[in-house]
Every structure is written in structure tokens, then in C-alpha cells.
Regions:
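Short cysteine clusters
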Residues: 111
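Glycine-rich nucleophile elbow surrounding the catalytic serine of serine-hydrolase chemistry
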Residues: 115-120
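Cysteine-based protein phosphatase catalytic domain of the PTP/DSP
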Residues: 7-106, 124-159, 165-167
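Intrinsically disordered, low-complexity regulatory segments
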Residues: 1-6, 16-17, 23, 171-201
């Protein structure tokens, strides 16, 4: 594994602050010692809420026992490349509003690798916060270079439906989205392969 490949792999569980209230990352390590080290990093970073988007796993018990002050929100979903529902995005937006109503939150939004589901939900939250369609993509990719944001189209669709916005505006914003992805392609298959590869390889 080259130094560049090791750097790509290292993004998996790295905390990636996007704004002062939003951070994205991958999931906790499987071994207890590694997971506790990460949780301490989350606490040091001021994380108040964790939004876990993995259908395949839950860390609710781990967070409850080792970081009870952190609010854990489980919104597990698939990562099969198909569409994500409006209801799933709406649930994430409800968490955002709930956290803000409770004080001054710092949300950690994550899935397994922090490539698609987590960044896509974070994108939905940025749109809800008033960010421009393309500027939100830019800030996510700058914060986390392995963020592919595969469900961005679904996030945009859910945003327009949630707020009853003009369908013509959706078409225009969707085209801006497509143009950005065309100009900012990343090799997702390579990133996934490197993350799955043993560290000693």
C-alpha cells in the first residue's frame, strides 16, 4: 500500500468537521479499546448528538454505557445504491431541529465508511440550514475527500417536497448537482477497497 493509499484509508474513521455544528465520519471500531478511543475523541470534539445511519449495525448500547451525555439517534438505512426515501431524510432533519431546540448542538453524522449515507444526510441538513445546492457539496468534499454523497439527488428531492418548492427550481438545481458530480468524480470503488484491506497489506 502506497503512502497516498494509506492516507485515503485513514479517512475512514477520521472526524471531519463541516461546520461548527456538523461533523461527518465513519463508524466505531469493532474492538472495544479502539471504539472507546474514538468515543473519547468525539467527546473532546464536543459532539452532543450522534446520528447513526447504518442499517447493518447499532452502537446504541456502547454510547449509552460509555458516553451517556451524547444523544444517540438511530436512523439505519440500506446502502445498495437505490433511492433513499423522503421519510428517511425527514427523520434526519427532525433530529437536527430537535437538537437545536435543546441548545447548541454539534452533530456527528455517520454510516459505516462515511462515503455515502452519512455525507448524504449531512447534505440534507446543510440544505435545510439554507446552504446553496453546490456550495453544500463543496464544503462536504473539502471536509472529507472520500465523501461520494451518492444520495444527494434524493436529499434534494426530499428538500423540495418538504418545503413545497417550485418543481422548476428542482430541475435547475438537479442539473447543477449533476454538473458538479461530473466535474468532481472520485474513485469510490478504490476507496472502499482500501478501507476493507487489512492495515498490514
Amino acid at each position: 500500500m502506497t503512502s497516498d493509499e494509506r492516507e485515503l484509508r485513514a479517512w475512514h474513521r477520521r472526524l471531519c468537521p463541516v461546520t461548527d455544528w456538523l461533523t461527518i465520519s465513519g463508524d466505531l471500531q469493532n474492538d472495544e479499546e479502539g471504539a472507546l478511543t474514538q468515543i473519547r475523541e468525539w467527546q473532546s470534539a464536543g459532539i452532543t448528538d450522534v446520528v447513526d445511519l447504518r442499517q447493518e449495525w447499532s452502537d446504541e448500547d456502547v454510547i449509552y454505557h460509555h458516553a451517556p451525555a451524547i444523544h444517540y439517534h438511530y436512523l439505519g438505512t440500506h446502502d445498495n445504491g437505490g433511492a433513499q426515501s423522503d421519510a428517511w431524510f425527514d427523520a434526519g432533519i427532525a433530529v437536527l431541529h430537535e437538537a437545536r431546540a435543546a441548545g447548541d448542538p454539534r452533530l456527528l453524522v455517520h454510516c459505516h465508511m462515511g462515503i455515502n449515507r452519512g455525507p448524504s444526510m449531512a447534505y440534507a441538513m446543510l440544505l435545510e440550514d439554507g446552504w446553496d445546492v453546490v456550495e453544500a457539496l463543496e464544503v462536504l468534499r473539502q471536509a472529507r475527500p472520500i465523501a461520494a454523497i451518492a444520495y444527494a439527488r434524493d436529499a434534494l428531492r426530499a428538500h423540495y417536497r418538504r418545503h413545497g418548492l417550485d418543481p422548476a427550481g428542482f430541475a435547475a438545481d438537479l442539473e447543477r448537482q449533476r454538473a458538479w458530480f461530473s466535474d468532481n468524480h472520485i474513485d469510490v470503488a478504490k476507496v472502499i477497497r482500501l478501507i476493507r484491506q487489512p492495515a498490514s497489506a
